[in-house]
Amino acid sequence: MKKIFTLFIIMFSFFTKGNAQYDQLATEFSFNDTEGKEISLADYKKKVILVVNVASRCGFTNQYEGLQALSKKYKDKGLVVVGVPSNNFRQEPGTNKEIKDFCETSFGIDFPITEKLSVIGSDAHPFFVWAKKNYGSGAVPKWNFHKIIIGRNGKVVNTFSSITKPSSNRFISTIEKEHKN
């Protein structure tokens, strides 16, 4: 009987450990900014968080302008935009300092920009690994300027591909709906 009970406990612990990530919230992750300072999503609990993988040499780079406008318009209502530079698609070759300078001088970006990191593959940042495991392939960036909206509850509400502009009606209505929740 002891052996069966022990076996049951071992099997149960494997099962719960394998599913523990599903209980994790986006607000349990953190990034470093371009200067190495921590950007903890826990600081944005009860806010709507928009995580976007970005790049300075992409055909969608002009979306920085729309992201900044969105940040400015909804910041006081509790929206936080977090830009995540990535060279996974070979369009962000710059250093962290170059990325920061580009964002500030070209688009007046004042929302948090992380250090350059991987958003796909075996070396993807844990946030993106979590998003994929919990929300499927739709949460995985297929290109730069993939957008992940996190609700006030810390869970992914929706994802939008690169072709969806930050000014699109569907995108804006998702943001506004989350602000009402």
What do these predicted regions represent?
Residues M1-D23:
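Bacterial Sec-dependent N-terminal signal peptides
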Residues N19-A42:
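N-terminal "domain-start" segment that seeds a small globular fold
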Residues S30, K97-N144:
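Short, internal strand/loop/helix patches
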Residues K47-V48, R57, T61-V84, E104-F107:
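Conserved helix-turn-beta segment immediately C-terminal to the redox Cys motif
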Residues P126-V129, K133-N181:
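Thiol-/selenol-based redox modules, centered on thioredoxin-like
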